[in-house]
Amino acid sequence: YGVKDATKIKVRKAVEECGYLPNQVAKDLKSQKTNLVGVIVPRVSSHATSQGVDGLTAVLEQAGKHVLLASTHQTHHKELEYIQIFNQKRVEGIILYATHLDNQLVKAIQSSAVPVVLVGQDGSMFNIPSIVHDDTRVGFEAGNRLISKGCKYMGFIGVQGDDIAVDKMRSEGFAQSLQFNDLTLQFHARGDFTIDSGYKLAKQYLKEHTKLDGLFCATDRIAIGAIRAIQEAGLVPGKDILVLGVGDDELASVCTPTLSTFNYAFDKAGENGAKLL
């Protein structure tokens, strides 16, 4: 229905006098757009996560979008739950930092009413847009680097086995490098992403593998824990046992000795995830 110009003027004047602020929900309902993007991460304390969120936020804000951040605390059912919640909140898309990819998660993503982009796990075989690192190559390069320094007895400390990228692919690349050089992986330990996990596992396996001279850890924080265990065993990290991590965590440069690591450019992965969405 038409509104007279005189009425419009009166309404505008009343708005100005009362200091009225427009209702964003009402505006969104009218435009059918919320300008919201849901971001699901395994934990907010992670260096990889914080760098990634910084990267994607910069891209999304430039496009006039706002981020809703949810942490699953590395709990699988929370990933499924937040996909459903974000759909109910009418977000325009979801960026999911998944720690693994199973049938339940694939079905949840495929049934989502809004686009979902995976970061860190490869969903391309299910036609899910994905941003992934070449984790197998990183593992292979880690092996080559340790071997070039003279290491012959090497182990790998990873995370839970259902994490395809961080545990499976990095360890496989590492083992391939060793096999190529006629060497055998001494052990593959599994824990979580914490410094404490790296410490406890390294402490355990150092007792079982006294010839160990090289250690590849799936993340920098795991490696930092391992360095502590090596020192407590009366050994010198970087001399008696060489340690490599992944991620270029800021802690890598302040631990003693400083940690050798691979820079993963997590901020770029976040940026690319936002652009792909």
PLM regions with names:
Residues A6, V41-Q51, L69-K78, I131-E141, ...:
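Hinge/beta->alpha junction and helix N-cap segments in small-molecule ligand-binding domains
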Residues K203, E208-L277:
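Flexible loop/turn connectors
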Residues Y153, T184-Q186, V236-L242:
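Short acidic capping loops at alpha-helix termini that bridge into adjacent secondary structure
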Residues P22, S31-S45, A63-K65:
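Interdomain hinge and pocket-entrance segments immediately C-terminal to HTH DNA-binding domains
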Residues Y1-N35:
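N-terminal helix-turn-helix DNA-binding module of bacterial transcription factors
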